[in-house]
Amino acid sequence: MKLVFYGAGNMAHAIFTGIVNSKVIDSNDIYLTNRSNEVALKEYAEKLGVNYSYDDEALLKAADYVFLGTKPYDFESLAERIKPFITDKNKFISIMAGLPISYIREKLEADNPIARIMPNTNAHVGHSVTGISFSSNFGPNSKDEVDELINAFGSAIEVPEDNLHQVTAITGSGPAFLYHVFEQYVTAGTRLGLEKAQVEESIRNLIIGTSKMIERSELSMEQLRKNITSKGGTTQAGLNALSQHDLESVFEDCLRAAVDRSVELSSQDED
């Protein structure tokens, strides 16, 4: 199985680094290419022990899976460049936000299998939750291979393409939403009189420890919360204060706004 990455930006870098580190395939079977920054490309390739090239014909002749990791606005020119060299064995995996499978197929002028994936920045530490949708001609064995690749940098959740908007909101943008919540926690903690550095370090460790509790426990998050909430205690007092601000509606509004924007961006790209 040979992989070609078009684009070596932040997310593509996290993905191919995760795949290399997992050893799910030999690093010599991975090829990188980008639009113009050969210095950065060569540095990535040498550091990871993978190949790099600007020969589109040779790349597509070799590739089983072609990762499309360019900026969405650069894709049309990329498609124009590579479509003469597409072979029957090429299967495409898009990490470009907002571009539907139908649009990608139209620009490539090819009936090859196409998957869209929506990872998040936790791919950098091997813990992305990645939404994935497949075109109807993606075979079961190929799907298994793609799942194996995605598991190299996290976990996969397969959904119909229309539901990628929801996945984008919940898990794609999710790290930023949680970071914002943690920021507010730090700010509130400093207002209680502690040094900011103390609060930041405490909350960082609190987040890590709580994540491990969720990971290692078979209990629901609701039950984990109940287990540490004593009637009439300090935790109950704080939760009572939180409940007065209708957090459920706050988070629902947050996610709906992200979904709506994802739909809007997708519609713009199709025009």
From Swiss-Prot:
Belongs to the pyrroline-5-carboxylate reductase family. It comes from Staphylococcus saprophyticus subsp. saprophyticus (strain ATCC 15305 / DSM 20229 / NCIMB 8711 / NCTC 7292 / S-41). The gene is proC. GO terms for cellular component: cytoplasm. It comes from the Bacteria. Its EC number is 1.5.1.2. It catalyses: L-proline + NADP(+) = (S)-1-pyrroline-5-carboxylate + NADPH + 2 H(+); L-proline + NAD(+) = (S)-1-pyrroline-5-carboxylate + NADH + 2 H(+). This is Pyrroline-5-carboxylate reductase. It is an enzyme of class 1 (oxidoreductase). Pathway: Amino-acid biosynthesis; L-proline biosynthesis; L-proline from L-glutamate 5-semialdehyde: step 1/1. It is found in: Cytoplasm. HAMAP family: P5C_reductase. PANTHER family: PYRROLINE-5-CARBOXYLATE REDUCTASE (PTHR11645), PYRROLINE-5-CARBOXYLATE REDUCTASE 3 (PTHR11645:SF0).
